[in-house]
Amino acid sequence: MDNTYYQLPLELWVKIVDYTDEIYLLLTNKSFFELLYLVNVKMDTIKYVVENNLSDVLKHIVELKNINHPIFDKDIITLESLNKYLKKSCKYGLIEIVKYLIILGANIKERDNIAVGKACENGHLEMVKYLVSQGADITVDNNYSIMKASSNGHFEMVQYLINEGADITA
């Protein structure tokens, strides 16, 4: 696939992707992906990457951020999208995805630490431990996290939250 990229001018690749209005082609090759800032696809890139559990693509996005790639000059990767899919990734226990979203700037404390609450509610103990290590507050919103963990029968989670300072009487 690497050779295919160089067989056509960039302008033609941009036209092909714009015509199909899908980013799937851009995910087949790192060189293709870097064209994302040139196309007019109306798709939420982070949504697609997270919903398909493409942690390698997120890793590449982090690499692009580290070199100040033009992909970050346009609103292709937005804080709103990062925060939204951080919450969803916590809900489904996608810890590798969560790590990359945080590196990209997702806010674990957004909306009263809802991300850690979703992880507690769904029993993802390793996720909760990671979020706490990154500064998530398990006591906000009247100890929402322990309330959700206990109401869903995640007793090991409840024990961990108590050890971390959650208030069972709240």
From Swiss-Prot:
InterPro entries from the UniProt entry: Ankyrin_rpt (IPR002110), Ankyrin_rpt-contain_sf (IPR036770)
Keywords, alphabetical: ANK repeat, Repeat
Positions annotated as ANK repeat: 41-69, 81-110, 111-140, 142-170
Keyword match Repeat: yes
Gene3D superfamilies: Ankyrin repeat-containing domain
Name by which UniProt lists this protein: Putative ankyrin repeat protein R846
Organism: Acanthamoeba polyphaga mimivirus (APMV)
Record lineage: Viruses, Varidnaviria, Bamfordvirae, Nucleocytoviricota, Megaviricetes
